[in-house]
């Protein structure tokens, strides 16, 4: 950690098609081996499919899906006197988005559909309907935090 000054967070350029920073971040998370144009085409075709299914605009449908996957609390390990406790802590807004996007991409990669665009579209539509692997992951994290509520006073 630097001692001199706090280093500001880099500004992310909004994506070219919709002008959304959130979507640009999602493309970056999906990107493999620096192939951004490939990642963008996958995301855009997935969003088109999603918009046709839901009847909403591409960005609106994406926002709904992301909102249903965002976690509000998570557990962090805290060592107290020789034993480790899973302490529930609130998730910061930036991390909420990052976790939600990461979980959606992971869930889409594990699906068995034909193309990645189709997998992503299916996972996003499942997330919009509050079902699917990414939503299940959020529920598991929330359940874990609820189960360890007794250790909330160890927060730092």
From Swiss-Prot:
Q: What keywords are annotated for this sequence in UniProt?
A: Ribonucleoprotein, Ribosomal protein, RNA-binding, rRNA-binding
Q: SUPFAM superfamilies per the record? A: Ribosomal protein S7
Q: Which InterPro entries match?
A: Ribosomal_uS7 (IPR000235), Ribosomal_uS7_bac/org-type (IPR005717), Ribosomal_uS7_CS (IPR020606), Ribosomal_uS7_dom (IPR023798), Ribosomal_uS7_dom_sf (IPR036823)
Pfam families found in the cross-reference section: Ribosomal_S7
GO terms, biological process: translation
Which Gene Ontology terms of cellular component type are present? small ribosomal subunit
Q: Which molecular-function annotations from GO does this UniProt entry contain?
A: rRNA binding; structural constituent of ribosome; tRNA binding
Q: Which HAMAP family match?
A: Ribosomal_uS7_B
Q: How does it assemble?
A: Part of the 30S ribosomal subunit. Contacts proteins S9 and S11.
Function field: One of the primary rRNA binding proteins, it binds directly to 16S rRNA where it nucleates assembly of the head domain of the 30S subunit. Is located at the subunit interface close to the decoding center, probably blocks exit of the E-site tRNA.
User: What family does this chain come from, according to its entry?
Assistant: Belongs to the universal ribosomal protein uS7 family.
Protein name as catalogued: Small ribosomal subunit protein uS7
């Amino acid at each position: 950690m630097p001692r001199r000054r706090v280093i500001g967070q880099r500004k992310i350029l909004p994506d070219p098609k919709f002008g959304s920073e959130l979507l640009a971040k999602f493309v970056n998370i999906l990107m493999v081996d620096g192939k951004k144009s490939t990642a963008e085409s996958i995301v855009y075709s997935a969003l088109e499919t999603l918009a046709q299914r839901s009847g909403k605009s591409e960005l609106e449908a994406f926002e709904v899906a992301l909102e249903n996957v965002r976690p509000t609390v998570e557990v962090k390990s805290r060592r107290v006197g020789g034993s480790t406790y899973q302490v529930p802590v609130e998730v910061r807004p930036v991390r909420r988005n990052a976790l939600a996007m990461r979980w959606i991409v992971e869930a889409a990669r594990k699906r068995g559909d034909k193309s990645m665009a189709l997998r992503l579209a299916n996972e996003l539509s499942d997330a919009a309907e509050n079902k699917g692997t990414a939503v299940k992951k959020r529920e598991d994290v929330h359940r874990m935090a609820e189960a360890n509520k007794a250790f909330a006073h160890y927060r730092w």
